[in-house]
From Swiss-Prot:
Catalysed transformations (reactions): (6R)-10-formyltetrahydrofolate + 5-amino-1-(5-phospho-beta-D-ribosyl)imidazole-4-carboxamide = 5-formamido-1-(5-phospho-D-ribosyl)imidazole-4-carboxamide + (6S)-5,6,7,8-tetrahydrofolate; IMP + H2O = 5-formamido-1-(5-phospho-D-ribosyl)imidazole-4-carboxamide
HAMAP family named in the record: PurH (MF_00139)
Record protein name field: Bifunctional purine biosynthesis protein PurH
Organism: Paracoccus denitrificans (strain Pd 1222)
Primary gene name: purH
Keyword flag Isomerase: no
Pathway terms, separated by semicolons: Purine metabolism; IMP biosynthesis via de novo pathway; 5-formamido-1-(5-phospho-D-ribosyl)imidazole-4-carboxamide from 5-amino-1-(5-phospho-D-ribosyl)imidazole-4-carboxamide (10-formyl THF route): step 1/1; Purine metabolism; IMP biosynthesis via de novo pathway; IMP from 5-formamido-1-(5-phospho-D-ribosyl)imidazole-4-carboxamide: step 1/1
InterPro entries xref list: AICAR_Tfase_dup_dom_sf (IPR024051), Cytidine_deaminase-like (IPR016193), MGS-like_dom (IPR011607), MGS-like_dom_sf (IPR036914), PurH-like (IPR002695)
Pfam families cross-referenced by the UniProt entry: AICARFT_IMPCHas, MGS
Database matches in NCBIfam families: PRK00881.1, purH
Record-stated family: Belongs to the PurH family.
Keywords, sorted A to Z: Hydrolase, Multifunctional enzyme, Purine biosynthesis, Transferase
Length: 529
């Protein structure tokens, strides 16, 4: 296989014309003949460059509104012919097929068309046919052809030519071929995913995923694991779309925890007041609403000050200077918010390692979406957990009715519990968590852990009693036995929200009545693993 191949003839046909003229001018200066089509040819000619229309080479005009223009043997023969195969070259000579050494194609903007909510027919018209066919042909024949599918690679092509006497090396062509195949695979995956949604196919026979490399990470969850961060192209506000104002590069764990924090805090409508969540290891260690952002932060912080050290903080509202100043009192890895004031940015500027992210908005917690989990030999796909419970959805199952404040706290705790690793127990008072038990194999153990954490914080804050006294509690799944409710009562809880559905519901309800608790069922579970 020949290593260095000279570039004598290029075919350029692009939708994204960023950097096109400068790139083509640099090729022309190296003596490269340029073939082109439609709008690309027009742009190049207007820039004063010499261009040969593909139609003049094929002897066949563009037709059917541009649907057919490069699907021709003269084009594909020029891309696929093996230069070291005598039969291939004889056939090319016989049919007057000239070789194409460089293919520059970026595809119709299908993904962008779908993202802006275009009509079905408009999306169909933005499915590229000729482009992917040429890209695949050129990539297959990378032994002799260089393929470019991304404007960010123009500079790399010119650098390769400069370093190799206007030739490209095999390693470079192989790299470009891999990029090309990844692009066509992602493009087809986008079309397939869109069409499945358009026809209401929830479990298509095949499902494909693709992402654009956003960041090569230093390591994964642990230093011995390699890692990278990819964006999927969606515009959902969050860590993938955020602007980083300062601080070190985000780590794998930073990204994972920041996503968990922002998705949680977005559950709380900013029109109803500020909310703050503090996260460690993808679990909340404090969540609160408040009269102001700083009030919400301080109340969330007071849930578990020890665990908050080195945590991730998310706000559902603009980060202001007062809140920023309060946050600087403890070591924090990342702060994410829809926006931040200039004063807040100035305060954080003194904390060089603190990462500040702004997103411009909040993700819609009710929006449909998919969640994935890899298992050995496959992966699981499910809808995003966007279940929401309102007061009207609750069923009171005990003799005692919850008070209005208890109902508000129950719904608040229920929302937080949705984002706590199972088994999850969340104690809340006055729209703030006061104890969280997470990730235990036994629900009663989570109940006891939440109580103990509240007692520890009460002692640290100099309080006479734990804040679980008089609290309302959420459980992400039903209580299989009465012991869980008995443990809640021992912690001083007064009201409980849970899905219900246990074969022992009657025993659990009887225990709640005996202990004077109010209990409501949601009929909805929030396991999180």
């Amino acid at each position: 296989m020949t290593d260095r191949i000279p570039l004598k003839r290029a075919l350029i046909s692009v939708s994204d014309k960023t950097g096109l003229v400068d790139f083509a001018r640099a090729l022309s200066a190296r003596g490269v003949e340029i073939l082109s089509t439609g709008g690309t040819a027009k742009t190049l000619r207007e820039a004063g460059l010499s261009v040969v229309d593909v139609a003049d080479v094929t002897g066949f005009p563009e037709m059917m509104d541009g649907r057919v223009k490069t699907l021709h043997p003269v084009v594909h023969g020029g891309l696929l012919a093996l230069r070291d195969n005598d039969e291939h070259m004889a056939a090319a000579k016989s049919h007057r097929i000239g070789m194409i050494d460089l293919l520059v194609v970026n595809l119709y903007p299908f993904e962008a068309t779908v993202a802006k909510g275009a009509a079905y027919d408009d999306c169909i018209e933005n499915i590229d046919i000729g482009g992917p066919a040429m890209i695949r042909a050129a990539a297959k024949n990378h032994a002799f052809v260089t393929v470019v599918v991304d404007v960010q690679d123009y500079a790399a092509v010119l650098a390769e030519l400069d370093a190799n006497d206007d030739r490209t090396g095999l390693a470079f062509r192989q790299r470009q071929a891999q990029i090309a195949y990844a692009r066509t695979a992602a493009y087809d995956a986008a079309v397939s995913t869109w069409m499945a949604g358009a026809i209401g196919e929830e479990t298509p026979r095949r499902r494909s995923f693709s992402g654009q490399l956003a960041q090569s990470l230093r390591y994964g969850e642990n230093p011995h694991q390699s890692a990278a961060f990819y964006r999927d192209g969606s515009d959902r506000p969050g860590v993938a779309t955020a602007r980083q104002w300062q601080g070190k590069e985000l780590s794998y764990n930073n990204i994972n925890d920041t996503d968990a924090a922002f998705e949680l805090v977005a559950e709380f409508d900013p029109a109803e007041g500020p909310a703050v969540a503090i996260i460690k290891h993808a679990n909340p260690c404090g969540v609160a609403r408040g009269d102001s952002a700083v009030d919400a932060y301080l109340r969330a912080f007071d849930c578990d000050r020890t665990s908050a050290f080195g945590g991730i903080i998310a706000l559902n509202t603009t980060l202001d200077g007062e809140t920023a100043q309060a946050i600087t009192e403890i070591f924090t890895e990342v702060v994410i918010a829809p926006d931040a004031t200039d004063e807040a940015k100035e305060i954080f500027a003194a904390k060089k390692n603190l990462r500040l992210l702004t997103t411009g908005g909040l993700p819609d917690p009710a929006a449909p979406g998919l969640a994935f989990r890899q298992v050995a030999g496959g992966f699981l796909v499910q809808g995003r957990d966007n279940g929401r419970i309102l007061r009207a959805d609750l069923k009171v199952v005990t003799k005692r009715q919850p008070t209005d404040q208890e109902l508000a706290d129950l719904l608040f705790a229920w929302t937080v519990a949705k984002h706590v690793k199972s088994n999850a127990i969340v104690y809340a008072r006055d729209l703030a968590t006061v104890g969280i038990g997470a990730g235990q194999m036994s629900r009663v153990d989570s109940t006891r852990i939440g109580k103990r954490k509240s007692e520890d914080m009460a002692e640290a804050l100099g309080l006479a009693q734990a804040l679980t006294i008089g609290s309302s509690v959420a459980s992400d799944a039903f209580f299989p036995f009465a012991d869980g409710v008995e443990a809640l009562a021992a912690a001083g809880a007064r009201a409980v929200i849970q899905p219900g559905g246990s074969m022992r519901d009657a025993e659990v309800i009887e225990a709640a009545d005996r202990l004077g608790l109010a209990m409501v069922f949601t009929g909805q579970r929030h396991f999180r693993h």
